[in-house]
Amino acid sequence: VSTLSGEDIERQGITTLEDFSRFVSNLNVQTTAPGQNTIVFRGVSDGGGFLVDPTAAIYLDEQAMSMTSMAPDIYPIDIARIEALSGPQSTLFGASSQTGTVRVVTNKPDMEGTEITGNMAIGVSGVSKGENGFDFDATANIPIIEDKLAARVSIFSAEDGGFIDSVAGMSVVDEYTGLGGLVSNYDPVNPHTDTVEDDINGVEWWGRRAAVKWQISDDWAATVTHNHQEIEANGFNDFDPMVGDLETVKF
C-alpha cells in the first residue's frame, strides 16, 4: 500500500488523481478532461472504452465512486490520506478492483472537547501562457455531545486556469474524405466564432461535505456522510502540435 498523508497532499498541491499518481510507483492515471480519468495499475487497463467498466476502482472512505468508462476526481479537502492498493482487491473492495484501488480517506468528526474548531485556506495560482486560478476551502468540527456526538462540515471552491487555445484553422477529420481530410472551422456565412477562444480548458470546482458521528457504545459507532461535488470544464486538455504550441482547432 502506498500512502500520502493529508499534510503531504496539501504541501505538494495535489488536487487530481493525475497529480497523486506522480508520487506512486506502478500507478498511472490517463486524463482526458477534468473528472474523466482511467486508472492504470502495473500497466494493466481496459483501454478506457465507451461503456466499459474500469479495472481499477476509486473509493471515498467506504463508498465506491467509480463510474462506467471513467474514474472521477475527488477534490482533496479535509483529507486524512490517500491510499493506492496495487493488485487485485476484489475481496475487500468488490467490482472494478481487479488491478487495484485508490482510496480517499477523509477526516472524521472529533467528539473530544466542547469547542468548535476549524480552519480556512485561500490560494492563488498561475499557468504559463494561460489563466490565473484560485482555491478556497473551509472546515469546521462541531462537538455536539462530548464523547458521544459530533459533526464535521467542509466547503470548497476552486478554479484551475486554462492554457489551451482554440484557434481558427483547418482540422484533419478523415484522411480518406474527398476534401483530403481538411475541414475549416471558418466559414464566411457561419464563421463558428464561438469555437475560437483562448484558454478553453479551464476548470471550476465547488462542493461540500458533511458528516455526523454518533458513538453508540464503546464498541459501536455510526457515521452518516453527505458529499456533493461539481466540476465544470470548458474543454479537453489536448492540443495539436501541427496547429501550434498549446493550440487546437475545434468546430
Label for each model-derived stretch:
Residues 56, 61-88, 138, 180-182:
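Short acidic/polar hinge/loop motifs at secondary-structure boundaries
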Residues 18-63:
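Extracytoplasmic beta-strand/coil segments of soluble accessory domains associated
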Residues 1-12, 20, 37-39, 56, ...:
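N-terminal periplasmic "start-of-domain" segments of outer-membrane beta-barrel proteins
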Residues 37, 54-56, 112-118, 147-151, ...:
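Outer-envelope beta-barrel architecture signal
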Residues 9, 20-21, 82-87, 102-105, ...:
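Non-catalytic regulatory/gating segments with a bias toward low-complexity or hydrophobic composition
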